[in-house]
Amino acid sequence: MKVDINAIKELRDLTGAGVGDCKDALTSCNGDIEKAKTYLREQGIAKAYKKSNKDVSDGLVAICIDGNKGAILEVNSETDFVARNEKFQKLVLNLAFLANQYGIENIEDFLKCEYANNTNINDEIMSNIAVIGENIHLNKIGCLSVSSGVVCGYIHNPIVDNLGKVGAIVALESNCDVEKLKIFARQIAMHIVATKPEALSLDVLDQNVIDKERDIIKKQVEQLNKPASVLEKIIDGRMAKFYQEVVLMNQMFIMDSQFTVSELIKKKEEELGSSINIVDYKLFIINK
């Protein structure tokens, strides 16, 4: 049958599939656009599963913030070329929005959630794999919320708003002025992206990380031929410096190196007249 060029254009606009694929679909479905959409979806998903085992080494990080809750996620692609594809970017931003709406960090559970028009998130990703032509992998999700306070985020060198290669969200609990708290929270998020801490506070830093670093330092100072009591003080001093590098609350604040983050919070509490607590943060870096 002869396929109407306008039908091909409409189907292409609806699905993002190529002209040839749209023509084949309409031919197979006797010009019925709805059936052709289903046909393309079935064919596309079959192609997508073949692509879904390819390595992914690029991608984007997206954030979505809504007052006292926020989400961050990392979606991987095979190449930077696709990471700069407008359709891929729209997908990633939509996924961040849904992650914030659902508040689900578990990937398997999130993929089962509704996307739109009775499709689930996994189906939408597979559909995009078929259209874009590269594997797409949802790598991780982070969600934060507070009952009183704010969640803020920061993307370094954004490609478009809320989308880039490195990003962070942080949750601050406080009863102080919300707008002033937002400014401070964004500064903390920027600090996190710049310094890349491994833990919020010393009490949640992995004990294995602590033990490994202490063992390394111990072996380094053994060669100094000092009394044991002196060596122990040297070890403690170097460990304190290590904590200042990897623990957020112990780090020197990048915008005012006179203060650690912990000291700055106390200063802000006095300034804003209310206690401030960093509940948690999430830092995502492509392929790290």
UniProtKB/Swiss-Prot annotation:
Q: What is its main location?
A: cytoplasm
Q: Where in the cell is it found?
A: Cytoplasm
The job of this chain, per UniProt, is described as: Associates with the EF-Tu.GDP complex and induces the exchange of GDP to GTP. It remains bound to the aminoacyl-tRNA.EF-Tu.GTP complex up to the GTP hydrolysis stage on the ribosome.
What protein family is recorded? Belongs to the EF-Ts family.
| Name listed for the protein in its UniProt record | Elongation factor Ts
Molecular function GO terms recorded: translation elongation factor activity
Q: Which InterPro entries match?
A: EF-Ts_dimer_sf, Transl_elong_EFTs/EF1B, Transl_elong_EFTs/EF1B_dimer, Transl_elong_Ts_CS, UBA-like_sf
Establish whether keyword Protein biosynthesis is in the entry: yes
Any GO CC annotation of this UniProt entry: cytoplasm
Q: Which UniProt keywords apply?
A: Cytoplasm, Elongation factor, Protein biosynthesis
Please give the organism.
Answer: Ehrlichia ruminantium (strain Welgevonden)
Annotated stretches, region: Involved in Mg(2+) ion dislocation from EF-Tu:
79-82
Tell me where the signal peptide lies: none
- Coiled-coil stretches noted in the UniProt entry, renumbered to this chain: none
NCBIfam families registered for this protein in UniProt: tsf
Record HAMAP family: EF_Ts
User: Is Cytoplasm included in the keywords of this UniProt record?
Assistant: yes
